């Protein structure tokens, strides 16, 4: 028996993003991808490529069972939510490819003119990853985003915030008062957490 695909829209703390949650797995557990343009999605995610045909779509983030879409400021969600929800639902229902292959990790794609920071493996990496996975990732995913641990060096934990967390007005507070305090409590060696 085929279970019909359902997709519902869920607001996030970031007013420019909306989370579209499916009753089907879109990617493997722990996998996520983010695309800032149709060109970035080309050859990786046909779903994201098609979503960029909507003129108001600025970013597409896909993970286990949801797609988070970031829109331009000039169109209210009231006018586009149903159209996007139906599009995602129909794409999944028709068996359209969500992802053909994983792109190179986002941490290895520097912004133009910026160098990529390469972190040495530290004795704290596993403990930090475990704390982020257990306490932080579920809450961040619930808000339509993701957190990626990039490295630890001299008391500083560096992470990447993705999906609805990227550019969210409350992400700085979450980072400093939530994540940083949690890591400091469990690992006194941690002095600060920064996002890139």
Model-assigned labels for residue ranges:
Residues 1-196:
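Domain-level signature for proteins that mediate thiol-based redox and metal-cofactor handling
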């Amino acid at each position: 028996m085929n279970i019909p695909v359902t997709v519902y829209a869920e607001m996030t703390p970031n007013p420019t993003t909306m989370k579209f949650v499916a009753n089907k797995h879109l990617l493997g557990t722990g996998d996520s991808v983010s695309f800032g343009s149709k060109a970035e999605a080309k050859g990786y995610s046909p779903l994201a490529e098609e979503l960029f045909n909507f003129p108001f779509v600025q970013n597409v983030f896909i993970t286990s069972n949801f797609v988070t879409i970031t829109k331009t400021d000039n169109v209210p969600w009231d006018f586009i939510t149903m159209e996007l929800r139906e599009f995602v639902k129909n794409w999944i229902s028709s068996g359209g490819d969500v992802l053909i292959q994983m792109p190179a990790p986002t941490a290895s794609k520097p912004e133009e003119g910026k160098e990529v920071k390469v972190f040495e493996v530290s004795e704290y990496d596993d403990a930090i990853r475990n704390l982020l996975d257990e306490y932080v990732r579920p809450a961040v995913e619930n808000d339509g985003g993701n957190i990626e641990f990039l490295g630890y060096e001299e008391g500083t934990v560096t992470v990447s915030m993705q999906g609805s967390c990227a550019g969210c007005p409350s992400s700085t507070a979450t980072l400093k008062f939530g994540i940083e305090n949690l890591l400091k409590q469990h690992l006194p060696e941690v002095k600060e957490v920064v996002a890139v």
